[in-house]
From Swiss-Prot:
It comes from the Bacteria. InterPro entries: Lgt (IPR001640). It comes from Staphylococcus haemolyticus (strain JCSC1435). A 1,2-diacyl-sn-glycero-3-phospho-(1'-sn-glycerol) binds at R137. GO terms for cellular component: plasma membrane. GO terms for biological process: lipoprotein biosynthetic process. Its EC number is 2.5.1.145. It is an enzyme of class 2 (transferase). This is Phosphatidylglycerol--prolipoprotein diacylglyceryl transferase. It is a multi-pass membrane protein. NCBIfam families: lgt.
Length: 282
């Protein structure tokens, strides 16, 4: 099928009865790019790349499962009536906060089993996670979901965004806030900041700054969305969780500052991989 930018079909292609969605492809691309960047980062902290494979592999799998379970729990009245749709993730419906929770818990467990420092591993993968999130939001765009409230075309034009985004924000006769784009830009900016300043940070601080940065952006973007998971009629789950994560991040940051540890990336330059590499430990 031809790719039409004026209206993007959520289905990338079909193989017989099987439809492959852009949503899944983009999420997979985000994970792969994040994995590559994390592997490159290992060269500068003295860890062999094989030390990270199990952490990322199991965290990605159980994080993805947790993301779906989290979404289903907060939409249980619907899924209780339609249980056959619970595994249909290609229709969308995964919650990033659920994925983070599942991935973090799994990562800590694997780190303990492999005798790895979870703060060190967290610092290595944090830039990769936020970049993957920024890329993954384009999957929501392809699915025509996770948008904000109604706006005018003039409003979108004043944002100076590409025309194909404006046209695909025209859904069932109404233009909507491209909240996917707001969050994607915020996440990618966070990625650039983290890999630029991480060599000046102490162990554990890159990860905690990721938590704080992502949560601040998510809190404000969530307020614009029309499909939020709601705890009550006035409390959005994602905003509540974001506030909790900001507090947790600040507590960890203060603790790590009091308990001094040197920078993890003394030899790594921002966005460059040509400085002297640390001796690799297997």
């Amino acid at each position: 099928m031809l790719f039409n930018l004026n209206y993007i079909d959520p289905t990338a292609f079909s193989i017989g009865p099987l439809s492959i969605k852009w949503y899944g492809i983009i999420i997979a691309v985000g994970i792969l790019i994040g994995y590559f960047i994390a592997q490159e980062s290992l060269k500068y902290v003295g860890l062999h790349k094989d030390r990270l494979v199990d952490v990322i592999f199991y965290s990605a799998i159980f994080g993805f499962i947790a993301a779906r379970i989290y979404f289903v729990i907060f939409q249980w009245p619907y899924y209780a009536q339609n249980p056959i749709e619970i595994p249909m993730i290609w229709h969308g419906g995964i919650a990033i906060h659920g994925g983070l929770l599942g991935g973090f818990i799994t990562g800590i467990i694997v780190c303990k089993i492999k005798n790895l420092n979870p703060f060190q591993i967290g610092d290595i993968v944090a830039p990769s996670i936020i970049l993957a999130q920024g890329i993954g939001r384009w999957g929501n765009f392809m699915n025509h979901e996770a948008h904000g409230g109604p706006v005018s075309r003039t409003f979108l034009e004043n944002l100076h965004i590409p025309e194909f985004i404006i046209r695909n924000m025209y859904i069932e006769g109404v233009y909507y806030h491209p909240t996917f784009l707001y969050e994607s830009i915020w996440d990618i900016l966070g990625f650039i900041i983290l890999i630029t300043i991480r060599k000046h940070l102490r162990v554990g601080e890159t990860f905690t700054l990721y938590l704080i940065w992502y949560s601040i952006g998510r809190f404000f973007v969530e307020g614009l969305r029309t499909d939020s998971l709601m705890l009550t009629s006035h409390i959005r789950v994602a905003q509540l969780v974001s506030v909790i994560l900001i507090i947790i991040g600040l507590v960890i940051l203060i603790y790590r500052r009091i308990k001094y540890q040197p920078s993890l990336y003394k030899e790594a330059g921002p966005l460059t991989w040509n400085s002297s590499k640390a001796k690799v430990k297997s």
